[in-house]
């Protein structure tokens, strides 16, 4: 257990660990208990009743948050010809093909997301061992392997976030910055929560959403009562 600083311990006193808070109150507490001296990221963590070892209980995808994450993401598009032109017009930060694959092989990583057209995936596969461990490998499930490169770039720039269940059955997703209005964070939270409910694997048994927590970077976690979240039917 890491040693906590004085500011963290003081902030943690404001939170009742035995209580699950209404989502708005939880987010207000996260803002109040932020101990970072910068505009910290607010993250939601879901503990799910799934067995990620089973192929039919894997959860992975992406969703556009209505208010973005507050982070500018640099997009590399691997495409040729007309698709490369479309990516440039859409505002991709870098556009190319094997030239950028060679750069990545040499240790270049000045980007946050890769979008690739399906015809480029044979080449991209050559650097799979480099991209995979960093979570940068393009994937059709997250909309990053597509011929509609303009749409992919626009969605990423608009605040698209990826989610993926880890080995312990948890999903962590950023929903904005502590400087965001509470309402915007609540709406971003509701969007990702609604998405997680929609992608419940048919094979999952028992309670699906076991626990939901929100926290800021370096701040204490606050338990959320999911029943207080307004979810569209």
UniProtKB/Swiss-Prot annotation:
One GO location term (cellular component): large ribosomal subunit
GO molecular function terms noted in the UniProt entry: rRNA binding; structural constituent of ribosome; tRNA binding
Pfam families: Ribosomal_L1
Cystine residue pairs: none
GO biological process, one term: translation
Record flagged with keyword Signal: no
Signal sequence region: none
Highest taxon of source: Bacteria
Keywords of this entry: Repressor, Ribonucleoprotein, Ribosomal protein, RNA-binding, rRNA-binding, Translation regulation, tRNA-binding
Family: Belongs to the universal ribosomal protein uL1 family.
Subunit structure: Part of the 50S ribosomal subunit.
PANTHER family, per database record: 54S RIBOSOMAL PROTEIN L1, MITOCHONDRIAL, LARGE RIBOSOMAL SUBUNIT PROTEIN UL1M
Function: Binds directly to 23S rRNA. The L1 stalk is quite mobile in the ribosome, and is involved in E site tRNA release.
Protein name: Large ribosomal subunit protein uL1
Organism: Anoxybacillus flavithermus (strain DSM 21510 / WK1)
Lineage of the species this protein comes from: Bacteria, Bacillati, Bacillota, Bacilli, Bacillales
Gene field: rplA
């Amino acid at each position: 257990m890491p040693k906590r600083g004085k500011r963290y311990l003081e902030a943690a006193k404001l939170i009742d660990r035995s209580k699950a808070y209404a989502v708005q109150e939880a987010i207000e507490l996260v803002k109040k208990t932020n101990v970072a001296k910068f505009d910290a990221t607010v993250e939601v963590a879901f503990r799910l009743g799934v067995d990620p070892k089973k192929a039919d209980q894997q959860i992975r995808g992406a969703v556009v948050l209505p208010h973005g994450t507050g982070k500018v993401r640099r997009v590399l598009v691997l495409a040729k010809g007309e698709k490369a032109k479309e990516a440039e017009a859409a505002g991709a930060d870098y556009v190319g093909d094997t030239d950028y694959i060679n750069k990545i092989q040499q240790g270049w990583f000045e980007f946050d997301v890769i979008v690739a057209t399906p015809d480029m995936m044979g080449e991209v596969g050559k650097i799979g061992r480099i991209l995979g461990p960093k979570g940068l490998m393009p994937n059709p499930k997250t909309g990053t392997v597509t011929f509609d490169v303009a749409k992919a770039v626009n969605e990423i720039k608009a605040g698209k976030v990826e989610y993926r269940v880890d080995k312990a059955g948890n999903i962590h997703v950023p929903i904005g910055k502590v400087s965001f209005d509470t309402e915007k964070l609540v709406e971003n939270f509701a969007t990702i929560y609604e998405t997680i409910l929609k992608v419940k694997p048919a094979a999952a048994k028992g309670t699906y959403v076991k626990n939901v927590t929100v926290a800021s970077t370096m701040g204490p976690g606050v338990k959320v009562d999911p029943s207080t979240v307004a979810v569209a039917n």
